[in-house]
């Protein structure tokens, strides 16, 4: 989609390798896309195993998990267990900032009519009982 293309173009422009990943609802973006809100993001690996080709492109060790600490007690940015890659954080953080900037300054939306919201997904707040944590009806 359009968000993925923003990231792809950014990485290419920076001379950085990148690869698409499945956008399958596994993460916290599911409710956004269910509500018709465009979503996209970055992925640096989880419990998958790095291939020899990926190790040659991105570094690391073939046959090892992308993130051996994924959802484990050692998954921390606190010493002594800091398993955060400063390089990955810088590259992905810059890509995210670029995407936010690109989307924020555009005058067109994601839909065929140029809008920022799909007409079929438009919802009036008047039909909800709550606004934030406040009961309004």
Features from the language model and the residues they span:
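Secretory-pathway/membrane protein signature
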Residues: 1-137
């Amino acid at each position: 989609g359009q968000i993925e293309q923003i990231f792809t173009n950014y990485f290419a422009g920076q001379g950085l390798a990148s690869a698409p990943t499945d956008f399958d609802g596994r993460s916290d973006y599911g409710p956004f896309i269910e509500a018709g809100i465009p979503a996209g993001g970055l992925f640096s690996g989880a419990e998958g195993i790095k291939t020899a080709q990926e190790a040659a492109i991105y570094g690391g060790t073939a046959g090892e998990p992308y993130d051996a600490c994924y959802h484990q007690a050692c998954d921390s940015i606190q010493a002594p267990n800091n398993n955060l890659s400063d390089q990955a954080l810088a590259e992905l953080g810059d890509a995210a900032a670029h995407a936010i900037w690109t989307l924020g300054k555009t005058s067109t939306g994601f839909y065929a009519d140029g809008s920022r919201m799909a007409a079929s997904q438009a919802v009036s707040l008047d039909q909800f009982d709550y606004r934030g944590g406040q009961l309004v009806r």
